[in-house]
Amino acid sequence: MIEVLLVTICLAVFPYQGSSIILESGNVNDYEVVYPRKVTAVPKGAVQQKYEDAMQYEFKVNGEPVVLHLEKNKELFSEDYSETHYSPDGREITTYPSVEDHCYYHGRIQNEADSTASISACNGLKGHFKLQGETYLIEPLKLPDSEAHAVFKYENVEKEEEAPKMCGVTETNWKSDEPIKKASQLVVTAEQQRFPRRYVKLAIVADHRMYTKHKKNLKPWVFQMVNSVHQIYRSMNVLIALVYLNIWKKNDKITAQSASNVTLDLFGNWRETVLLKRKRHDCAQLLTAIDFDGPTIGRAHVSSVCDPKRSTGIVQNYTEINLVNAVIMAHELGHNLGMDHDGNQCNCHACIMSAVINNPPSERFSGCSMGYYQTFLTAYNPQCILNALSKRDIITPPVCGNELLEEGEECDCGSPENCQYQCCNATTCKLHSWVECESGECCEQCRFKKAGAVCRAARTECDIPENCTDQSADCPTDSFHRNGQPCLYNHGYCYNGNCPVMHYQCYGLFGPNATVGQDGCFDANDRGDEYFYCRKENEKYIPCAQEDVKCGRLFCTYIYDINLCRYDYSANGMVAQGTKCADGKVCNSNRQCADVNTAY
């Protein structure tokens, strides 16, 4: 058996090195599977939000524990955020969705001075973080009954072998080189970085190609991108707030061209003649999936913010990596705010305003960019970005029947002849007096669903289905069966709504032909070395007691070669907490095979 284990060490020390997987961010060559553990809880008596204001998650990266601190980005949306899309027959529909309890966060890694994070917590953790100078991406793995996530370095996402992508801006901001010379000599101190607070109310338009490409995922994809743009501009004391999203579901409102300069001009004309009359905003960015000519992936007018036609930018969605698209948008927005491309004289060869997109993309502004921005504020004094967004920022007075939800209206479904929304009185643009709700898992035809109607099905046999109460449109808080209840025909015990068993963990690590290794494989966990152990205390590996060996390193095999002892060297290759290790026993937090009645 020892000989088999030695062979395994040679073959499987790094089972993910060289392995690949197709994720939402693309084809990833090397990744780790992690199980983020939430280590914060809502205090007793506190109001339970769907998404808490602050959270912490613990997981391991490269075998070392990290704690990810997250804070909700409460400045992501304007107070009057609205969306416009189009019905199948082409009618324009504008709504004002509630976005206060959203799921987009900024954060940092604990004890990492230069760390940042931009994370969506809507369905698992998705986004990016900086750790020890490297950019990591994280996203959930689509495994049954699992909280597994993939963590991988940006460099491990496969990129197409092609010419470097770049911005299409060629115009120069200033008539002389003086601002460039001053900026290149600038040593930016903390005091100098305290730019005056400015507010950019951002409108985003997604064309039909974008909708076809992303479908229902388009909105969260845009929100995640703007969350990253918001974080990037914090260093400049510029608040980027999303005020409006327009999705061209049915057809485009302009005919986008592969020539980026033509598309930018067309979009500017449409913004001036249509969009500004619909919603007040400071800058508009067009997201498109068209392939621009040459290496161009974005374009914008320089020093143009507040200009009715020129305060625009266009961004090509050329990659599935959300962070890259966010950096491109931040770059084009930088042009709107007076920044030129970084030259050789700048103190950063790979910052945001570099003409060529870098790998990984930078989230820093150079000293040149700071100088350009400061000079732009002084020379142009743009008025539209001076003040925070007002509570209601609609330009035209409300008109009942125009299918736009405006000040003083509870609903607007069009004329009485065309109204298809039964909750709304089309004559008054008020909800009918009998209306109990408009939306929600427990709302149906404007009334609360009857008590007992299932609103959230059980994910697993350890989960509990939630039922409507006849008192609210919202589904009750998710709950699950008690920890320790037998599950999967007594092959496991419930733990936090899941049924962790070794077989499924092997499946997640090594594929559908994998199963649990023979008992003799686990005896290696009594060694107490860097490969086989139960705990790590003060940099020392603690061997497993004989009764605890099935709570240390997980051993798997293949159904066609049961004598093989296969294992995963990373932290994800340890037996998961709550896993059954013997009859009536589970692995506790100390990796001891403990009685199921006391383990939790």
From Swiss-Prot:
Domain Disintegrin positions: 397-483
Keyword Hydrolase assigned: yes
Annotated cofactor note: Binds 1 zinc ion per subunit.
Tissue expression from the record: Expressed by the venom gland.
Pyrrolidone carboxylic acid modified-residue sites: Q192
Pfam family, one: ADAM_CR
Alphabetized UniProt keyword annotations: Calcium, Cell adhesion impairing toxin, Disulfide bond, Glycoprotein, Hemostasis impairing toxin, Hydrolase, Metal-binding, Metalloprotease, Protease, Pyrrolidone carboxylic acid, Secreted, Signal, Toxin, Zinc, Zymogen
Active site: E332
Listed cofactors: Zn(2+)
Subunit structure: Monomer.
Role played: This metalloproteinase-disintegrin-like impairs hemostasis in the envenomed animal.
UniProt name for this protein: Zinc metalloproteinase-disintegrin-like stejnihagin-B
Natural source organism: Trimeresurus stejnegeri
